[in-house]
């Protein structure tokens, strides 16, 4: 599955018409599926655009408040698009992860009852140790009833051995975000796959070995036009798969 998280090209998806044109370009580049992102309105019109151009929707990514407050509409969008996974990410949680997980588990039960999987997408703040000495990711791995949706860049940014994390948690991973990290004179930034310093090839090989088939290209910040970045990344991915 050659997938992309359309947050990557968000400047090209501000309206339905723009999204339609951008998703057509993604399909022409060789992508055959997408993961949607945004508020409920954006999820709705990008789902419509994806269906119009013939791109499979593997899932959506939003936040806990949005999915809690728009449950019925979200499930409608999921069924319309054929998507199967609902993902959330969170702002910094720290030791407050316990309360967040309680709410997430309540929604997970509802999502599962409606035929959908529910996943947590990490950034790097989950790897900061709180006053208890534990990291938010420890609470999430131990207590979250849903799946994990790891992000390779943010795992690396959090000081984690990316391949080991994927290996240790493989049973809970259905979707993996592929994102490269580039070193600059000012620190680190996002880059197209294969243009950074991460072992993306090794990560892909490990994912294949573990049966993780939903590999999703994502780039939070692009130095040039994001559609060009999407092209560079899929060309790399085609060669690596």
Language model features: what each stretch is:
Residues 44-61, 107, 111-116, 231-235:
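Short acidic, glycine/proline-enriched helix-loop-strand junctions
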Residues 30, 54-56, 80-85, 143-148, ...:
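Glycine-enriched alpha-helix->loop->beta-strand junction motifs that scaffold or abut catalytic
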Residues 11-16, 33-46, 63-70, 91-98, ...:
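Acidic-and-aromatic substrate-binding clefts and catalytic sites of carbohydrate-active enzymes
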Residues 113-197:
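Acidic/histidine-rich catalytic cores of soluble enzymes
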Residues 1-80, 84:
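N-terminal pre-domain/capping segments
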Residues 224-241:
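C-terminal helical cap(s) of enzyme catalytic domains, especially alpha/beta-barrels
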């Amino acid at each position: 599955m050659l997938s992309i998280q359309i947050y990557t090209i968000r400047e090209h998806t501000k309206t339905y018409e723009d999204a339609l044109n951008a998703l057509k370009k993604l399909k022409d580049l060789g992508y055959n599926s997408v993961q949607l992102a945004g508020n409920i309105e954006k999820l709705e019109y990008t789902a419509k655009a994806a269906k119009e151009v013939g791109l499979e929707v593997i899932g959506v990514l939003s936040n806990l408040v949005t999915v809690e407050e728009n449950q019925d509409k979200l499930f409608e969008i999921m069924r319309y698009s054929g998507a199967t996974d609902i993902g959330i990410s969170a702002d910094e949680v720290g030791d407050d992860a316990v309360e967040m997980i309680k709410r997430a588990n309540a929604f997970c039960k509802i999502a599962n009852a409606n035929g959908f999987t529910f996943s947590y997408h990490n950034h790097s703040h989950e790897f900061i140790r709180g006053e208890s000495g534990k990291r938010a990711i420890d609470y999430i791995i131990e207590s979250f009833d849903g799946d994990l949706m790891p992000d390779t860049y943010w795992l690396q940014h959090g000081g984690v051995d990316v391949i080991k994390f994927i290996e240790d948690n493989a049973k809970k991973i259905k979707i993996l975000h592929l994102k490269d990290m580039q070193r600059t004179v000012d620190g680190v930034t996002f880059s197209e796959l294969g243009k950074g310093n991460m072992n993306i090839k090794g990560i892909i090989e490990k994912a294949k070995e573990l049966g993780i088939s939903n590999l999703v290209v994502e780039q939070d910040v692009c130095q040039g036009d994001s559609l060009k970045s999407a092209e560079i990344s899929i060309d790399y991915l085609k060669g690596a798969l």
